[in-house]
Every structure is written in structure tokens, then in C-alpha cells.
A protein has these predicted regions:
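Alpha-helical scaffold elements lining the catalytic groove of polysaccharide deacetylases
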Residues: 95, 124-138, 144-174, 184-195, ...
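Active-site beta->alpha N-cap acidic-glycine motif
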Residues: 21-26, 31-135, 166
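C-terminal domain-boundary segment and adjacent tail
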Residues: 43-77, 168, 194-214, 219-225, ...
Length: 242
């Protein structure tokens, strides 16, 4: 009887099957010139522009976490070829370089901020975070100092309560979405994230949890040396149509 009730609850809570996913892209630092070598966590502004141009020219539409959550729960239809664009780790270049490129193609993104870096050299300031939010982008939480939440002995007030409050004060808006540092999660972390009022959480490439799909949404790290064409093929490979 308990198993039947659980199945009914899952059907009501998640109208989409766990295996049906929307592409979610994950970026980190952005640079100009020859200051860095492109890699899994670094991409040049020119290459980012090329990738976004390929998405736009091939009919992709950026969506927000609110739209994704409503779709998962069966409350909303998504536009053709939806994609979510996310940036981790609070780099100042998210504002100075990524935001203008996003605007060029009419895209919106999610910026997952670790609050220990706010205002430090090379990282987003409070004013920049507010400006991104005011432009229609979503500000999400990425803990206080990027501590992996599956490691045990976590100070949840420091890693969840305070960062959420800080970001909500800066933006004047609810902070409803979370990204796990290093993509690492366990059920204890999920329970804490839910208890702190987050509506969904994003990991990296590990398998989604069948019990908690909304709190283990997969993302693909986009390599800095991928061409636009390569990005399109990787999207189809990682998030195949169902």
C-alpha cells in the first residue's frame, strides 16, 4: 500500500519522466585575449559568442528555472528547442563579458553565486549581482565558500541560510535555486536544501535521482575549445530527445 501511495505521489509531483530532460549548460570563467588557455572551466569571450550564435541560429530559446520547474511539474509548455544557460563561481567576467553576449542573442541565464567572494578582486560585486538580476537574469545560490555538501560536517547556516539571505537582500528577490559545488550531492544535502526553501537544485553530469529529480537536475559543463557546431552535437548527445 505504501509503495502504491508513493507512486501516486510521484506521478502527481513530477508530470515528466525522470529521463526526459532539457539541456542545461554550465559555464565558469570567461577571458579575453591570450590571458588563459581554453579548458573545461575557461572559455574566451569570442568562443562564447560563437557558441551562443550557433544556439540562436539553430532555433534554441533560453528558459528560466521557473519555466523548467513548471514544465517538469506539467504546469507549462516550453518553447521549441529550450536550453538553460548557467554560470558558476561568481566571476566578474559574468557581468563584464557574458552579460553583453547574452543580450546580443536575447538570452537569459542563471548565475550561481558563492557569497564569500562578493566584492573581491575578480569576482562579482553586490552592484553587479543586482544589475544582473534587474536585467532579468536569475541569481542562484552556490553556498558561501564552495564547500562540497556531500563531505559531511556541514555548517548549514553558513553554507545555505546566510548566502540565501545575502543574495535576497542584494537582489530584492527570492533566491529559489541552488547549484551543488563540484556537482556533489547526497540525500542529506537534498533534505537541507529543501528545508531552506529552495525549489530545485542543479548538479553536473551524474545520473538524476529517481526519488528527487527536481533536486538533481543535470548540467553539462561546456568546454572552452568547443566550436558552436561541436556544442550543438554535444547537446544532442548528452540530452537526447525522448
Amino acid at each position: 500500500m505504501k509503495r502504491v501511495l508513493l507512486l501516486i505521489f510521484c506521478v502527481m509531483a513530477y508530470a515528466r519522466p525522470v529521463c526526459q530532460e532539457v539541456p542545461v549548460l554550465c559555464y565558469h570563467n570567461i577571458f579575453t585575449g591570450n590571458s588563459y588557455t581554453p579548458g573545461p572551466l575557461r572559455i574566451s569571450a569570442d568562443q562564447l559568442d560563437q557558441q551562443f550564435r550557433s544556439l540562436a541560429e539553430n532555433g534554441y530559446h533560453s528558459i528560466s528555472p521557473d519555466e523548467l520547474l513548471a514544465w517538469i511539474q506539467g504546469r507549462k509548455q516550453l518553447p521549441p528547442k529550450p536550453v538553460m544557460i548557467t554560470f558558476d563561481d561568481s566571476h566578474a567576467t559574468h557581468y563584464t563579458l557574458a552579460a553583453p553576449i547574452l543580450a546580443r542573442y536575447g538570452f537569459k541565464a542563471v548565475f550561481f553565486v558563492m557569497t564569500v567572494t562578493i566584492g573581491k578582486q575578480g569576482y562579482l560585486s553586490s552592484a553587479q549581482i543586482k544589475a544582473l538580476s534587474d536585467k532579468g537574469h536569475v541569481i542562484g545560490c552556490h553556498t558561501w565558500d564552495h564547500q562540497p555538501l556531500a563531505s559531511g560536517n556541514i555548517n548549514w547556516q553558513q553554507q545555505l541560510t546566510k548566502p540565501k539571505a545575502v543574495l535576497e537582500k542584494i537582489t530584492g528577490r527570492p533566491v529559489n535555486y541552488f547549484a551543488y559545488p563540484y556537482g556533489e550531492w547526497n540525500m542529506a544535502a537534498i533534505e537541507e536544501i529543501k528545508a531552506h526553501g529552495f525549489l530545485a537544485a542543479f548538479q553536473l553530469s551524474n545520473a538524476q535521482s529517481s526519488q528527487e529529480p527536481i533536486f538533481t537536475i543535470r548540467r553539462m559543463i561546456v568546454a572552452g575549445n568547443w566550436s558552436g557546431t561541436r556544442l550543438l552535437s554535444k547537446i544532442e548527445e548528452t540530452f537526447p530527445p525522448k
